């Protein structure tokens, strides 16, 4: 797992924002939601924004997380999506 200190600063469960930046693709937001659904089923409405040159797309999604491990698992799973460059 990742070596994070989320448990020192957050009280669980809580709403946690994830921003996924990847190659511009019409399906990126759907793929992000599909991965989140595997780890935290729910009804999600992500927001997305295309970069100024149209090369990248950022998808922001808020997820109710239950632990530090839950956050780390989501970071790792989201980063594994094809075309994803960063997860913030």
Curated annotation (Swiss-Prot):
Q: Name the domain of life.
A: Bacteria
Q: Which GO terms describe its cellular component?
A: cytosol
What the record says about family reads: Belongs to the UPF0250 family.
Matching PANTHER family: UPF0250 PROTEIN YBED
Q: Which HAMAP family match?
A: UPF0250 (MF_00659)
Q: Identify this protein by name.
A: UPF0250 protein Sama_2593
């Amino acid at each position: 797992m990742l070596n994070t200190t989320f448990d020192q600063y957050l009280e669980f469960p809580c709403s946690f924002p994830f921003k996924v930046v990847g190659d511009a693709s019409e399906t990126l937001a759907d793929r992000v939601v599909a991965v989140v659904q595997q780890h935290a089923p729910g009804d999600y409405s992500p927001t997305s924004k295309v970069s100024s040159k149209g090369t990248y797309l950022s998808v922001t999604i808020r997820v109710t997380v239950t632990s530090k491990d839950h956050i780390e698992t989501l970071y790792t799973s989201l980063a594994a999506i094809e075309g994803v460059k960063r997860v913030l």
